[in-house]
Amino acid sequence: MTREARTAVARRAATARWVRKRFGSPNFETLGFPGGDLVDTGLCDLADGKVTVESLLVSLAASRLRREGVPLSTVHADPEDRLCGLLSRSSGDLAHARYGAYLRQVSSFADACRRTRLDRRHRAP
């Protein structure tokens, strides 16, 4: 196994441990968070160094996701332009609509993380 592959495996495992510890589930999708499937896929793709719609979306929302406590080690450079380009190639005239829909999903995901974080804080002794 190459060094990069070992690093990717370690990043995925660390993310799963963090999500399990914080939310009691190994991933966001099973928690039912809106956009959780996109964020799960994006985190795995980032760990693997893949440039996908999901990894670019997570990179684009990195500052908000980090503020809500989502562990992000590395992100893609210039994610907004790269995501627009990728969507333009795959969706043509629908690229702008899909871009907006993806942003709304990741924003809803971050809102759900925030609500969960605040709920846990208020329940703590």
Task: Annotate the PLM regions.
Residues 1-19:
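Basic DNA-binding region of bZIP-type proteins
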Residues 21-33, 74-125:
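Long, low-complexity, acidic Ser/Pro- and Gly-enriched intrinsically disordered regions
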Residues 46-47:
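Hydrophobic/aromatic side-chain positions at a characteristic register within alpha-helices
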Residues 51-67:
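TPR/TPR-like (Sel1-like) alpha-helical repeat modules
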